[in-house]
Amino acid sequence: MIVQRVVLNSRPGKNGHPVAENFRVEEVNLPDCVNEGQVQVRTLYLSVDPYMRCRMNEDTGSDYITPWQLSQVVDGGGVGIIEESKHTNFMKGDFVTSFYWPWQTKVILDGNILEKVDPQLVDGHLSYFLGAIGMPGLTSLIGVQEKGHITAGSNQTMVVSGAAGACGSLAGQIGRLLGCSRVVGICGTPEKCLFLTSELGFDAAINYKEGNVAEQLHKLCPAGVDVYFDNVGGDISDTVISQMNQNSHIILCGQISQYNKDVPYPPPLPPAIEAIQKERNITRERFLVLNYKDKFEFGILQLSQWFKEGKLKIKETMINGLENMGAAFQSMMTGGNIGKQIVCISGDTSL
């Protein structure tokens, strides 16, 4: 059987911006036989995420993710349906997910890298397992719980940068659910600002491309900032940190503004900002959700419950077709998405 896959065509260079042409689609032959312990899956949805930018370099600069290889199939978060199984834990028709799903229309995988998912948890929206009821949701929930130090009733103000993205859009809502009295988002378009305040219940939103961010932040957070969910790093974060309170907390989720630069992760703060951080005893610890696997099961159930109760609003930007994986990745890296960027490979769940 001939199937399509996406391979890494070229590297953007450590300081380069990724483009769709860094990827290419090719046809390959899928083996006819599924061996013991393997399953054949049809890919339904694939995820593109900021961390993947590091995988485009020869060296990811990280000890927990490996680089993609030139002319080899690219992989990441995926959801699909099992067409044939020779693994004891799975049967034909099961829906499964993996963090290491090849960008391929159909593929034979080792069953041990897969996890079964229950469509009822997401009311049939299987792509949510790649977003709010998946790794971005867990990153937001566990990050806020473990590093945010939110105490209900203590009038804390939370600021979220990259607030209209996959993690940011969830983190702000979770901050409110856990007890923050004021939540302010920072994003890059008027449309995103409106989305945050009218659909997600943020108290206010700042478009960092318009006006003075420091002045707007001062006006919208008169009592200062207690919790900062940092998705972007760079100048925006320096501005927020300078308005943070004594003994406040930074949740270091991502540094997308720095991903096309050859700097360590997390990037060091400028000396003046670092001085503020130390003087005010602001915590800024690297946060890696994979260190909290023991909390995943409960976390998924909590996120699903909030979603079903209407307390957690979920937004996706969906593109169709494996051939658009590169374009979807490029768009996501430049803020083209609201909520989670997803690529639909096949909407067909019949067998």
Curated annotation (Swiss-Prot):
NADP(+) binds at residues 165-168, 192, 208, 231, 253-259, 287-289, 337. InterPro entries: ADH-like_C, ADH_N_2, GroES-like_sf, MDR_fam, NAD(P)-bd_dom_sf, PTGR2. Substrate binds at residues 99-100, 288-290. It holds the Pfam family ADH_N_2. GO terms for biological process: prostaglandin metabolic process. Its main location: cytoplasm. It is an enzyme of class 1 (oxidoreductase). Monomer. Belongs to the NADP-dependent oxidoreductase L4BD family. This is Prostaglandin reductase 2. It comes from Bos taurus.
